[in-house]
Amino acid sequence: MNIGIFCSANDDIEREYFDRTEEFGRWCAENGHSIVFGGCNMGLMGCVAEAYYQGFKSASHVQEGSNGSIVQDCSRGLNGLNGSRGAKGNLIGVVPRIVERGGRMSDRLTVHIPCDNLSDRKDLLLAHSDVVVALPGGIGTLDEVFTVAAAHTIGYHQKRIILYNIGDFWNTLIALLDDLQQRGMIRGHWKDYISVANSFDELTAMITQEA
């Protein structure tokens, strides 16, 4: 399964966010899922990439190359982009060229998809993901969450977003969504498009259900 991840690229944030992100990244690798993310080497993006890499190594899915890069011991998934439980996954980075030129691209990627701007990045992240998980993040993460949710409301796709509510991070957004719902501003119910996982076990159960 391809799991899209939206998250912060900032380093100066609470330690708990890194701990839970690391746990999730390792779980994805050890269960053969692929991750599709923004491909940055900073903040939670860098954390999930490193955790995925270490999870792959511990699960004996990969060997380490001489330069520390991932060398897979078998062919990648379908067209090099698909992972599923019991198969070898990929760490797929959708990286704007401006990020790459700035030296902020993760060196743990097994698949690199370049793009020209953030709009293209969002389209590609969604296209290559089966389900999306939003970890703590700022303006960019909110932009991605609402872009995917808005597209779902009018029928462009049926992919679910899961807010991983680490340390109650998403509580204020949940309250806003409830308020918008009460005011009649959301087509249907926001929970038709967005789920909330308040624990790691809830998160993995939701992902497993989507598989």
Q: Where in the sequence are the language-model features?
A:
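A cross-family phosphate/adenosyl-ligand binding-site feature
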Residues: 1-77, 83-128, 164-211
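Glycine-rich anion-binding loop/nest that anchors nucleotide
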Residues: 36, 132-138, 160-165
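Active-site/ligand-binding-proximal alpha/beta "capping" segment
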Residues: 119-153
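Arginine/glycine-rich "motif VI" loop of SF2 helicases in the C-terminal RecA-like domain
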Residues: 151-159, 185-186
